[in-house]
Structures are given as structure tokens and as C-alpha cells.
Amino acid sequence: MSFKCIFLTGGVVSSLGKGLTAASLALLLERQGLKVAMLKLDPYLNVDPGTMNPYEHGEVYVTNDGIETDLDLGHYHRFSSVNLSRYSTATSGQIYARVIKKERDGLYLGSTVQVIPHITNEIIEVILECARENHPDVLIVEIGGTVGDIESLPFLEAIRQFRYEHAEDCFSIHMTYVPYLQAAGEVKTKPTQHSVQSLRSIGIIPDAILCRSEAPLSSEVKKKISLFCNVPSTAVFNVVDVEHSIYEMPLMLSQEKISTFITEKLGLFTKKEDLSDWEMLVERLRHPLPNKIRLGLVGKYVQHKDAYKSVFESITHAALSLNCSVELFPLDSDDPHFLETLELCDGCLVPGGFGSRGWEGKIIAAKLCRERGIPYFGICLGMQVLVVEYARHVLHLEHANSTEMDKDTPDPVICMLDWQASLIATGGTMRLGAYPCALSPGSKVYAMYGQPEIMERHRHRYEVNFNYIQQLKDHGLDIVGTCPEQGLCEIVEIKDHPWMIGVQFHPEFLSKLIKPHPLFVGFIEAALLHSRNKTYV
């Protein structure tokens, strides 16, 4: 086999941080000079997470080629330089759909189609497709869910078969949770033992066990896990809960020397990993920064932090680059009192979303920011909020709205794209993926990007209505970014406002700790400037 494969499974409980672990491993292996590809296998039956409730699933991360994926791919992007595409993700829904299509097309020649071998063979094919597309030295495959879940069984069986065929080129990591019982005053290894037993009963013997814990595990505990899980004590690794930031994770794994252990077992010759730049950034995150701002994030999923995961991380990246700490206030736009908090903030960010709930509250927030000179950053739906508010209160189109919120509005300043009007199905009908955007010289965004054309990722159905663009321009709303191919409005700025910008795309999908997105940097800079004229109470 021309590549090595690392499989990452999880046990005991969900939400262990397998995605962060996989992303951190990718960073470490890249810093050792290896080319890495990544694949997330999700056992749920949805074809993709595009129509799943953000409260249940968190945000939907979009790739350049327009695939709606799990938020873990956002971690992969922010930590590493891996190429993420349609080959980087697969769900049970996709796997079953592929198999059923082949059966309908007669490709199984009348065979009885079963989970084994047809579903498992298709899972193996997905793994090989990812490798063929990316030509990596190492492919990291994260399996969602928890060992013992019935929906994970086909994926684990496929991995067992793959390891059997390519034993010398595969490495299996099982991640578990080792709880500390305060009443007993000790950690308990039994859940880890049972989880590994479940994995071994399927036929997968882990090459390493990665134990998540609240405090460092003693050598005695590691030896106990080694003995009862039948792995060498040198293959039992420990990561504790991070103190300050998720970006500490690669440094923890580096201290455990897990990447070196993996490369030696796989026979890979690598250079010593250099994390000096990462260490410097993390060290700054651990200490108070000289500047401080307050930001209000106005949305409708604010009770669930993962719903806006990439936005939160992008704010962290930009603020760190400016030696700034951010006190972030998640504000529910349905809360009748949220404006009281927003008035105290140095900036307001309205992220993407769908549906009418909370819509009017967001428009009120945009009006407050416009009238008081508070920096405002509208992303996707947040840009549409800006445009509708401007149309209502500056153009005096009292009933201006988006047809998503009011299909009978007399002034549809935001409307569905013509080519989508005839589509009925909800899934897969949006403008998805990376599109070019031409910037207007002399605009704020041109100064931030420093180039005439950019590529940004989209996920939306509605656009600024061409019929209202000239009116908006005449009243001071500049269209400073357009799609060269279709002339669609992609970026707006209010001419006489310190910093009020809306973008139809999702810049948060491109930000990294080591390379903050210029729009977020510009937004934080504007908020810092605004804060100098305020006194905190």
C-alpha cells in the first residue's frame, strides 16, 4: 500500500474530543514532514448534516467544493493544512445510498445485498478514494460515535477487514475516558477496560490507547490499563482537560510523544517536529492580553456553543493577532432585553442562519449599531439583516423584507435565486462552496484583503434583489464585492459608518490560528478603536 492509515475510534462516552485529537495528530505529522489526508466517517443515516438541527449537531462546515460536513472538519482545517473535500467525509446515509444505487443499476448481478460484504466493501472503497484523491503519506480516519453503538458496527468491521489486508500499514488508536470519582478519591479504569474489550470482540486490537482524564494519570494507572487491555505500557497515552484553549492539544500530544511512537511503528522516517510558532501563540493565549473588548454575538442558537464554532474560533484567532482579549456575549435575538447588553458592547456580530425566529430582533440590533456607530459584522443572514434594516429605515421601505421571512412582502430586497425557485427538495438546493468575489478598490474590504479578487465559501439560498441595488447605492449602502460570473452582491459597506460590513459568504470557514481571516482582524480592530471611546461599567 502506498500510504499508511491511522484509525481513531472512541469509547466509554461521546464528545471525547476525537476530532481535536485527529486534527492535532495531523499537525504533528505535518510538522514531521509528512503529507496528511483526513477522513471523517459518521455513522448517522442522514446523507449529510445540512438539514440537521444545530442544537443537536452543531454547526455545518462547508468545503471548497460545496460539501456540507461535520464540524470536526473545521478542526481539521484550523489545525492543519490538509485538503478537505467531498472525499474527506462520509456518512452511513451516503454509504447506503451508494450501495442501493449500485443494486438498482444491476451492478451486484442479482446477489443478495447485505451489510457484509456490500456495505463494508463500500466503506473500504471510501477510504481508498480519499487516498487516491490526496496521495498522502498518512491518512487519518476518524470514526464517529462510540464503540458499542449498533450504528458503528459496519464501520468497525470494515476497519477490521482493512487492517487484516494491510496490517503493516495500519495503526489503530482507541480513545477512552478515565473518570475520577471524588467520593472514592481515585480514578477508575474499568470503563476503559470494557471499551477495549468491546473493540477486541469485533476483532480490532488497538495499537495505542489514548486516555482522556481530568488530571494526569499516574504510571501505576497506565500500567493497570496496559495489563488489562493487553497493550504495552509505552502505548498508553494520556491527555488531560486543557486549561485555557483547545490549541494546547497538539502540545500535550507532542509531550506524550505519540506521533513519534506512531511513525516508528509504521516505519516512517521523519524529521523532528517543530512547534515553536504554535507554542508561542498558545503561550500568549495562556496569559492576559493588554487590550480588551466586548463583543455581542446576536443569533438564535446561542445556547449551544457548537452552533457557531467556527465563528468563535475565528474571533479568537483575530483577537490574538492583535494582542486582544474578548469578552463574548452570546445574545438571543428573541430575548426582549438583549439590547441592554448589546449597548455596552464594542462590536456586534450577526452570524449565518435560517428561518424567521429571531429575525426581527437581529434587525433591531443592526439598527442600533448603524445609529450609534457600533462596529457591525454581518455574515450570510447577518448581511441580509443589514440590507433589510437599511431598506426599512434609510430608504423608508417600511415593509421591506426577505422572501424567506415574508413571501408576500411588497419590497423583497432579499429574494431566492431564480435558478432555485423551481427546486422543491430542501437538502442540496443551496449555493454551496467557494466562489470568486471581485472587490471594489478604495473600499474597507479591499484594504483588508489587499487584493482585487478573493475566493470565499457560501451556504445560502437568498441574495440581494437586483431590482433594489441602485436604490441602496444611492442612499449610501456601497456594494463593494460582487461575483464576477453572475454579478451577485457579495459584500456591502455603509459609506458613512465607522465599520458596518455584511458578507454573503462564510469567512469563518477559512480562518486559522496561524493565519487569522482578514475580515475578522478588521472587525476586531474596529471594535478596539470603538472601545477607546468608552468606559466599562
From Swiss-Prot:
Enzyme class: ligase
Region (Amidoligase domain): 1-268
Enzyme Commission code: 6.3.4.2
Binding site for UTP: S14, K188, T189, K190, P191, T192, Q193, K224
Activity control summary: Allosterically activated by GTP, when glutamine is the substrate; GTP has no effect on the reaction when ammonia is the substrate. The allosteric effector GTP functions by stabilizing the protein conformation that binds the tetrahedral intermediate(s) formed during glutamine hydrolysis. Inhibited by the product CTP, via allosteric rather than competitive inhibition.
Binding positions for L-glutamine per the UniProt entry: Y55, G353, L381, G382, M383, Q384, E404, R461
GO function terms (MF aspect): ATP binding; CTP synthase activity; glutaminase activity; identical protein binding; metal ion binding
Entry binding sites for CTP: S14, D149, I150, E151, K188, T189, K190, P191, T192, Q193, K224
Subunit structure: Homotetramer.
HAMAP family: PyrG
Name of this protein: CTP synthase
Gene: pyrG
